[in-house]
């Protein structure tokens, strides 16, 4: 039996306590504009989905990261499954996932995941994970087991994976994915390179680009995807340069959304980007050659991912 862990105690203040660049908790919070729409968590479908997930000991990044679209997605019966536990080995200040020493991997999770997907009759699933720097392979073998179990149980389901950077283990990870490529390979850059020390401590911009490029080189027919969150201090020129970098590294799909601060202990919102600016970035990205672009204040990496892949306008 696992000892119960108070996940809330591993979030917020305790999570960012040892960061070199700490969020300013005394900073005045910027009022959200009218175009930022979030909903309260309620409804029978939401409760039903949560009950199904807990019964199978599964978690969603929607819940763990306090995604503002949780109610909408849950009410449509969709979710982004988060594998390998609720505890991340990184402490990114924009993210509300807990930080600490993760538990041992649950060897039954891949089967539970596949069974749940079959029970929910899903046609498109997104699988992401916490960072597992404690594992010798970064968790890539567990990703493979999940993909294999899903394909065995529901072979027609489309699978998108949103991966960590497999820091120091890119070649090992790519070797594993050779035998089980997903339908969409997603790895988010999150922000512009100059803001990495503040926004993504422990990550490396060039390294993330390298992961995306190498995967695409090995799997030219698999769609590659990445995402950015705006409002943390980036300039328009910096954003456009990132879009160009992504295209130079053969990334096909793009998501761009507004960063929202989970609590006062997290990275502060510097500005709320107007919807017109998001539309401008969408048009620029399409001109640069991205085949699919979802750009809008409430867009998240896996928000309506099944519609993104079909080219539907997501804002």
UniProtKB/Swiss-Prot annotation:
Give any Gene Ontology cellular component: cytoplasm
Q: Which pathway does this chain act in?
A: Protein modification; protein lipoylation via endogenous pathway; protein N(6)-(lipoyl)lysine from octanoyl-[acyl-carrier-protein]: step 2/2
Protein name per its UniProtKB record: Lipoyl synthase
> Which residues of this UniProt protein bind [4Fe-4S] cluster 1?
62, 67, 73, 302
Enzyme class, top EC level, equals transferase
- Its gene name is lipA
Q: Which Pfam families match?
A: LIAS_N, Radical_SAM
Check the record and name the InterPro entries matching this protein: Aldolase_TIM (IPR013785), Elp3/MiaA/NifB-like_rSAM (IPR006638), LIAS_N (IPR031691), Lipoyl_synth (IPR003698), rSAM (IPR007197)
Domain Radical SAM core stretches: 74-292
